[in-house]
Each structure stands twice: as C-alpha cells, then as structure tokens.
Amino acid sequence: MWRQGMFVLPFMTRLGVTNSWGGWTISGESTSNPGLWSYEGVAASHIILSGLLFLAAIWHWVFWDLELFRDPRTQQPALDLPKIFGIHLFLSGVLCFGFGAFHVTGLFGPGIWVSDPYGLTGAVEPVAPAWGAEGFDPYNPGGIAAHHIAAGIVGILAGLFHLSVRPPQRLYKALRMGNVETVLSSSIAAVFWAAFVVGGTMWYGCAATPIELFGPTRYQWDQGFFQQEIEKRVQTSVAGGASLSTAWSTIPEKLAFYDYIGNNPAKGGLFRSGPMDNGDGIAAGWLGHATFTDKNGRELFVRRMPTFFETFPVILIDGDGVVRADVPFRRAESKYSIEQVGVNVTFYGGELDGLTFTDPATVKKYARRAQLGEVFEFDRATLQSDGVFRSSPRAWFTFAHVSFALLFFFGHIWHGARTIFRDVFAGIDPDLDEQVEFGAFQKLGDVTTRRQAV
C-alpha cells in the first residue's frame, strides 16, 4: 500500500482493520461480510461523525450563551476553564486507558499490527503489556499497551485532581487561566509536541510504524540492514549443504524488495508528487541476486549507491575492498573496464536463476542495476511511470508533521505571549477594563458610583 501512495490505510491497518467491503483482505485472502470494522466502514463512520460534529458546531454557534458554569463569588455565568480542563483530561485518560487495556491487549478489540524486524510476518494480534525496562524499547509493541494503560491511569487521576482542586489564586492570575487564549496556547503546545514526537517515530521507525505498512526507513538502506540479513540467511543455508541457487531461492521476495533503493523514503523529493509506482513503476518480479566474477574467478561486489546521490560511478570491488572493475567515464583512459577485466554475471534465485551473462553490455546493464540493491523487473507502462524515484508516505508524513509542528511552535509562543503580556501590549491592566468602560459608572473610574440597570 505504501508503494501505491496510500496514506490513511496504513493507519487503519495498524489498529486492526484488515478487511474491505470489496471482498479482499490486507493479507491477500478473500472475505465476505466484513461489517463495520472494515476500511469502508471506518471511513463511512468518520464521514458521518464529521457531519454530526459540523451540525453540533452550528448548534453551539447559535446557542452560544449557555449558562453551564456560574462564578460562586459573583453568581454570574462564566466559563470555569480549570474545571473544563479537568473534564477533558479525565475523558482523554479514560480513552487512553481503554485503548491500552482493551483494544491493544485484545481483551475487547483486535489488537494491533505486530511484525518481525524485517517486515515479513506482520499480522494483527493481541499484545501483552511489557511492564519492565523492555517496554521502553521503541520496537517492542508491548510498550504501546503498557504506556497507554499507565498514561491513561495518570490522566484519569490528574483529571479528578483538577476537578476537585482549585488552582491557587496567584497561579491562576500568573498563567491567565481565566483567558481562553491561554487554552489556545497550551493546546497548541500539546499538539506541536505530539507532532514532533510522531515525526521522529515515523522517520526513524518504531513498533507503531511497521515497514510493511509504511515502507522501510532510509537508515535501513544506509546501514545495509536487509542486505546483511539476506547474506546471513544465504550463508546459513550454504553451510547446511544447500547450493547457492537453492539458498537464494529461499529468500522471500518481500525481503529482497526491501533491499532496493527505490523503496528508500529519502530517494524521492518534495517536488516529485505521486506514489512510488509513478516513479520506477509497478514491481513485476525479482530477477534474482546478481553475482559478478572476473576472468580469474574472483567474486566482485558492486558498490551500492548512497542515499543522497542521483548518479554514482559503477565500481566493482573484491572481498578486500580493492577496486577490480568499473564502468569508466572515459574509455580511452580506462584500466578496469568490464571488457578489460572480463567480468560476467550469474543470477541465483528469482526469475533468472542459474543464468550467466558474459556479454559486456548485458553485464554493465546489470551492474548499474545492482547499484540500486536487489534487481527487480518493473512495469512502467501501466501507470506511464517516468523512472524518477518518488518518496513513500513515511517521508510525507514526517515532512508534514515536522513542518506543522514548527509553525505551531511559533503559534504557541505567539498566543502564550499575547495572553501573559496582554496588559503590557494593551497598555491597560485587564482588571481595569470595567473602570474605564464608558457608561459602567456614573463617574468615570469611581467604583462607588456603579450605574444600576433598570
């Protein structure tokens, strides 16, 4: 789904929605009558809810003067903002606790998406809370359950505290708790902090942003994460007596596909819109692992392209890191060209399993493609793909949230300064408003001559 530019579906899926009214599931199986807990059902319920909220907004716009709270000292209608804060904190705590204790654990709900580090075995399943130090591992889904249960309890207790205890008068005045702009400023702070956090967890990866749903991170390419795992599996198979062809044939195509630079979210660009499939095309199949050897039988390895390069010289090195062959920029001065060194390429696993190519033009073609990781065949005709890499939803999510978090950070500073230094900006003490208001007193500023309404 991340290759197709799906943005909302991965978030639904990680919460346990896997079925569609179209009869398909995320795992490729067929289903019948998935009901409300489906992609379309969840989308429809949100559309209906948004409509109801819009109607509620109109109602409250019309009937805005609701006397829900009264100031006990003056008996005048007034918004009790600290009490409203306590109500919202309590309700959000209940929601947080309920999500962790019931939804994530599967006690009353489906659980969440859980997978292995290499994104191969992902499925929705119940998660047991991890209460020890292991719960702080960002890749441990048990920490998600434990955190929501713990944070929910804290939120419930804090909400009850703010419902039952009044803020000290000095603190109330210092933080301008009676001013609704204080609510705006502190709310913006909560939102931008959350946006920065989720931007980090999405870009660097964690249990809540599995690679099966959002695509790999750029650091997995930089560190050769999948390449090392593939090599480890192949070496284990060969050590067990399997041939190279058999060993590479046991590598899941999914794992090989992760080890391809086109899935690196940093390879796209902010000005290249559209899904990844509009770039290099729709992946049609793995051709196999390309192994290069020179005329002396020495195995050569193509140096892979770093993330932030659009073009990179084709260099083949041996096991000791010594350059043995290349595709030269100037053939007249070349010493290590494919033709001179006599390089051939053999494929293991995939569609070209067991085939060897000695033609220099073909060898150079696959050497260029091996720069980009495992070699895949792509269908570029269906979507008229232009061959220019696009970015995954992982990068777009990160960019959007960090950008808005930065804007909201300045918004928090702006509105916080406005509410705290309101008297400085206005030049008038806010408590003097009534005294200088025309018509409030028979004699301007004399509080003993309050004008009585008849």
From Swiss-Prot:
The record describes how the cofactor is bound as: Binds multiple chlorophylls. PSII binds additional chlorophylls, carotenoids and specific lipids.
Record carries keyword Transmembrane helix: yes
GO cellular component terms attached to this protein's record: chloroplast thylakoid membrane; photosystem II
Source organism, top-level taxon = Eukaryota
User: Which BP terms from GO are recorded?
Assistant: photosynthetic electron transport in photosystem II
Residue ranges annotated as transmembrane are 6-26, 47-61, 86-102, 149-164, 183-198, 403-418
- From the Swiss-Prot or TrEMBL record, state where the protein is found: Plastid, Chloroplast thylakoid membrane
InterPro entries from the UniProt entry? PS_antenna-like, PS_II_antenna-like_sf, PSII_PsbB
Please give one Gene Ontology molecular function term for this protein: chlorophyll binding
Pfam families, from UniProt?
PSII
**Keywords tagged on the record:** Chlorophyll, Chloroplast, Chromophore, Membrane, Photosynthesis, Photosystem II, Plastid, Thylakoid, Transmembrane, Transmembrane helix
Membrane topology qualifier: Multi-pass membrane protein
Q: Which family does the similarity line name?
A: Belongs to the PsbB/PsbC family. PsbB subfamily.
Per its database record, what is this protein's job? One of the components of the core complex of photosystem II (PSII). It binds chlorophyll and helps catalyze the primary light-induced photochemical processes of PSII. PSII is a light-driven water:plastoquinone oxidoreductase, using light energy to abstract electrons from H(2)O, generating O(2) and a proton gradient subsequently used for ATP formation.
What binding partners and quaternary form does the record give? PSII is composed of 1 copy each of membrane proteins PsbA, PsbB, PsbC, PsbD, PsbE, PsbF, PsbH, PsbI, PsbJ, PsbK, PsbL, PsbM, PsbT, PsbX, PsbY, PsbZ, Psb30/Ycf12, at least 3 peripheral proteins of the oxygen-evolving complex and a large number of cofactors. It forms dimeric complexes.
Protein name in UniProt: Photosystem II CP47 reaction center protein
Provide the gene name from the record: psbB
